[in-house]
Amino acid sequence: MNETGVKSDLPQPIFVPPHSGKALEFIGVTHILTTNQTGGAYYLFESVFGPGDGNQLHLHRREDEVGYVLEGALEIRLADQTVVVEAGSVAHLPKNIPHAIRNPLQTPSRYLFMTIPAGLDQWFDALDAARNAGTLDDALYRKLSLDYGIEWLE
């Protein structure tokens, strides 16, 4: 209901205070705005990579990614090039483009990522639940990845 008592189907504003998102420590991700909160429009999360941390070559079948470097730098490896983006820079990675990302520095780096459409948070949550249950191994990791449209190429 809005202030006049009339039911409204319009999206409502969301305000997220600092440090209030759900943190998934083992993968260095903090949910800021989830699939449920945005009605599936997008997912926003913060990620912290330690020195040299990152992931292997992969692609997303479902979502585009936009990354903003808050602190440090982000090294993005594509099929034929590697690009380093520094604090204040933005990177747009369309779906179906193979890429790997890592922190090239000797200090932690912080990033803000948005995926469009939403849904990647559900993959992170599934990984977190399996880890907490003690069932997360490489086979389950790869299965859950495929379930959420992520293909590991290395």
Task: Place the predicted regions along the sequence by residue.
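A short, N-terminal "cap"/entry segment at the start of jelly-roll beta-barrel domains
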Residues: M1-A41, A129-E154
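Short acidic-glycine-tyrosine-enriched beta hairpin
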Residues: F15-P17, D80-P98
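Conserved short histidine dyad/triad with adjacent acidic residue
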Residues: P17, G28-I32, F45-H60
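Conserved hydrophobic/aromatic beta-strand scaffold that supports enzyme active sites
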Residues: H31, L44-V48, V66, T82, ...
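Ligand-binding loop in jelly-roll beta-barrel domains
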Residues: T38, E75, K95-D121
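Short, conserved beta-strand element in jelly-roll/cupin
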Residues: L44-G50, L59-L78, M114
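Short beta-strand segments
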Residues: N55-L57, L78-V83
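A hydrophobic, small-residue-rich beta->alpha segment in the mid-to-C-terminal subdomain
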Residues: R110, F124-A130
